[in-house]
């Protein structure tokens, strides 16, 4: 028998916690025998004193086990269960293409996704731009869809890692969100509850990332990879660039439109294509569906060019309650903003840098994200035709097209876009799309 306050004291004094102490505390979080104040106190002691790998694994598994864990063995799927998780960014629509692409290559993707958080877009918010599509499925429906279609994307239910919800709510109001052990456990508790054989992490780097610096992102990636593998799930991470909007668009319906056009080969932003292909290739290799990157890319191109990936996306939408002909007629179903106009720069020159976080907050301010939990979202608003780093822009070349609900909203967004994009006389050096591949925790 343990006492929550003694566990807090032990960590406060810099001592490691045992697996049993961690599990006792997390069980108390779940059954409400641990108070919000005690959660806050332990979170702050972890923030200052960190956790070793064994503690991080124990915390993650305890949070996972606070709820239901999916077990795919009885489904006889005939292929590996694999998923991807991104630490979040702006215009990061990869999940909508990646899931169907992996399904078309023989994998099974049970993706539990989230809503937008701060400046970052949320996969669930994007999917809700599709009329009729259900984002909360019961276990039986989720299992059935993964088995039949190969991919399902839904929101976190009350049965999946419920302790995480209570801990995160406390972290959010106690300045402990950016603790690597707590971030790691929060991400992986939900992912491991999916019953995965393998996981690929997309850890963003740059002005629109959770961890803006390469060193911070690398530390987070190493922590996640170390804990996930320690918990029995084969995991690697890619560090990918978020110093500019990843897709050509940012905003819910606008990104869904771009995802469909990507899958049907109508339009593919080169950087979005490269990140998606890199993540998918890693998923196929770690899941045993491809023996090399070349083989993986060949299979993925075939899935796209044959139309199989687009067909899987269409089936996913239809099974989850969306229109059966959505892929063919998406422009008839997606909401359209009242006003769409280009934004031109105040001067001219090469785009030297972007405050990608500010561009994400511009979409939120337009109504495309939530500033309070109860806020409604305008799925139609956002940015399209985003200029890229290194582009030369002038009075005839727009920085972006702003989709807004009113002239006033458009004007505010236009000023925010101009302020977020810095021009110079010389084109900047091109940034890599993928910085690094992380396969093990730091020594």
UniProtKB/Swiss-Prot annotation:
Gene: deoA
Annotated GO CC locations: cytosol
Subunit structure: Homodimer.
SUPFAM superfamilies found in the cross-reference section: Nucleoside phosphorylase/phosphoribosyltransferase catalytic domain, Nucleoside phosphorylase/phosphoribosyltransferase N-terminal domain, Pyrimidine nucleoside phosphorylase C-terminal domain
One GO-annotated biological process of the protein: thymidine metabolic process
Protein's UniProt keywords contain Transport: no
The protein's annotated pathway: Pyrimidine metabolism; dTMP biosynthesis via salvage pathway; dTMP from thymine: step 1/2
Similarity annotation: Belongs to the thymidine/pyrimidine-nucleoside phosphorylase family.
UniProt keyword Transferase, yes or no: yes
EC annotation from Swiss-Prot or TrEMBL: 2.4.2.4
Organism annotation: Sodalis glossinidius (strain morsitans)
Protein name, UniProt field: Thymidine phosphorylase
Keyword terms: Glycosyltransferase, Transferase
Domain of life: Bacteria
Chain coiled-coil ranges: none
